[in-house]
Amino acid sequence: MSEITDNNVSYKSKETIDGNYATINFGPTHPATHGIFQNVLKVDGEKIISSEQTVGYIHRAFEKLAERRPFNQITPITDRLNYCSSPINNMGWHMTVEKLIQAEIPKRAQYMRVIIMELARIADHLICNSVIGVDTGALTSFFYPFSEREKIYEMYEEVCGARLTTNIGRIGGFERDFSPVFHEKLKSFLKTFPKAFEEFNSMLERNRIFMDRTKGAGPISAERALNYSFVGPNLRAAGVDYDVRVMQPYSSYEDFDFIIPVGVNGDTYDRFMVRQEEVRQSLRIIEQAYNNLPEGSYKADIPEFYLPPKEEVYNNMEALIYHFKIVMGETEVPVGEVYHSVEGGNGELGYYLISDGGRSPYRLQFRRPCFIYYQAYPEMITGMTLSDAVLTLSSMNVIAGELDA
């Protein structure tokens, strides 16, 4: 094993021969990892004997940053968790604060949230499944979903002006109602997306090469998945029908009719198929929410979290006070302790919040599903080949930004 000394620190190279086994690095900047994390693999030819994972390459101190910010300035931090479906992260945080302050959210705002969150789920699943296709050599299947994802990003822009890290919505609802352009784009999407999605699905679902590559790759049983605290599509692919939207409904999800798809073997193919069906179910939810969108306000009556109109600021002392407190980050919330979770794009995303009555959280912890999945990764790829390790990581949808908070 080669050794490098730099500033009295000793580094041992991982590219070495240990008896009959070779030890190699998979990451931290390997293109197949789709993120910044490292796996040190001990291999016998192509077969993986053991794996040791490393997190922290993209540490950004999410939690401590949030504990030093006003409540309404924490939303942009949540964008950087699973950035493939950031609106879900944003709204999960908003609902956590609303639970603490016991705010009553108008029905229209709840339905608007459902529409945006399900669009985000579709975008997340399209990215994940198209990357699985790329890792099996099906490059064309990568381009089809991205053209549809672009339409979702355009709808984000109409709501908040951003595309990837959205900072969408506010504590209490939205900053503005859906625009006429958004309505037109959503109607067009609901009309054209199903056909485009089935074209993408037909490229992979019954493709013999794709099936041979993904079936049996990176399996995990329902028992082991539960022991690791798996959630989301990875747990459902193992056969457990747990979904936060059904088990602990929020934002009026109990109003909508949809099914929870589950797999059998918990392998890469099942994870792919579960996400494919979840895209169809998300489309059903969006159609129901949009067709039954209630009248009313798009925001709750909590002026301490909403900038008042300029006319009121200039002519009303109370509005001026609210404006000042919001801009200066002086809005306080009651003393309390809450936990709230939402069904994120890759599983249950939870926020544990402790407030001491100040302008910032006393303690805020994120429950990040990717951190949990990554603990099981070495077990799932042991005995597999290197190519199976790549597919397993893609199908688990491990986002590096969530690993170290």
Regions found by a protein language model. Name each.
Residues 1-405:
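Metal/cofactor-centered catalytic core regions of large enzymes
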